[in-house]
Curated annotation (Swiss-Prot):
Free-text function comment from the UniProt entry: Removes the formyl group from the N-terminal Met of newly synthesized proteins. Requires at least a dipeptide for an efficient rate of reaction. N-terminal L-methionine is a prerequisite for activity but the enzyme has broad specificity at other positions.
UniProt organism field: Prochlorococcus marinus (strain SARG / CCMP1375 / SS120)
Protein name: Peptide deformylase
CDD domains associated with the record: Pep_deformylase
Name of the gene encoding the protein in the UniProt record: def
GO molecular function, one term: peptide deformylase activity
Length: 203
């Protein structure tokens, strides 16, 4: 996955944000992260019409909460805000690498090649399952100042963006898990209910 981290470093430098916050984990997330079974995770997020101080304040709180939970990505619906907003940082141990903020993201192109990789989610803690996704994507979005941006992402960055964008449509990674037997085992082991999963693929 070295290539994806290299791509992240290049893209992050281009998308450098003024909203970078301390990456040092705190004992308590600033915002509650909803977990599987909460209806907020199944709602569709709305486009943000105005990028203002309120949005930037929300971004900071999301970043603090993501770092507190030791995650690499967080979508606004996960904290109960139905807005098209993502924060991503694949290198949370490196204070010099800035996070990426994506507002109203749109994937304009998917690669024909696909990869299978294990995913997890702050909204389904402890559960890890294989998911198939396109290996690279092109994304249009706006940054925290409302400026239009583009990213050509591959590897882990592409997967993370797709995972977080699913949240904007009320979709969770467990819905896409390719092995139902493994899904059932993981859910039971970590105290989640199968009825809260909306299967989008079959074995």
């Amino acid at each position: 996955m070295a290539r994806s981290f290299s791509q992240l470093a290049i893209n992050a430098e281009k998308q450098r944000t003024s909203l970078a916050v301390s990456k040092k984990p705190t004992d308590q997330p600033e915002l509650e992260i909803h977990t599987l079974g909460n209806s907020a995770l199944r709602q569709s997020a709305k486009r943000i019409s105005k990028v203002d101080k309120n949005i930037r304040d929300l971004v900071k709180k999301m970043l603090h909460s993501m770092y507190a939970a030791k995650g690499i990505g967080l979508a606004a619906p996960q904290i109960g805000s139905q807005q098209q907003l993502l924060v991503i940082d694949l290198d949370i141990e490196n204070s010099a690498t800035p996070p990426i903020i994506l507002i109203n993201p749109e994937i304009t192109e998917f690669s024909a090649t696909i990869d299978t990789y294990e995913e997890g989610c702050l909204s389904i803690p402890g559960v890890y399952l294989d998911v198939i996704r396109p290996s690279s994507i092109k994304v249009n979005f706006r940054d925290e100042m409302g400026r239009p941006k583009k990213i050509n992402a591959d590897g882990l960055l592409a997967r993370c963006i797709q995972h977080e964008m699913d949240h904007l449509n009320g979709v969770l990674f467990v819905d896409r898990a390719i092995n139902e037997e493994a899904l059932n085992k993981e859910l039971k082991e970590h105290g989640f209910k199968k009825k809260d999963v909306l299967r989008l693929c079959s074995d």
